[in-house]
């Protein structure tokens, strides 16, 4: 399985390395690439691995991001709503889309439980048609999510119906 998580940090190299190290250190996961962009204040990581090892590495990296990234102090050109903005899974080498969808739900549920961060599923994992398009979920970004998340149609798929104070959604 391949995963390309996006983190809302592209400027602080120490924070970037702490997040990326979670992928480097995990057996069964291979870090293929990562790049940061200061203007967008974003880190994009590309990793592959067996689903269980990938899930473990992601949970550690997401935990690190929740701890290190404060969106109340964040600025950048890219729309964002969370310290970890997206976690797309791409089925490769014998993995199916159904397995990718199942993994996205497992990770989302675990993130919400461990870090008290609300999670929205999108694209093929979406729980409703109006959530398939990521732009619709992102509309309002971090600042607007506090009110949006209280609307019944924007109740998170997992986690509390309130924005995490610093990590967003």
Label the predicted regions.
Residues 1-169:
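Long, contiguous binding/interaction regions
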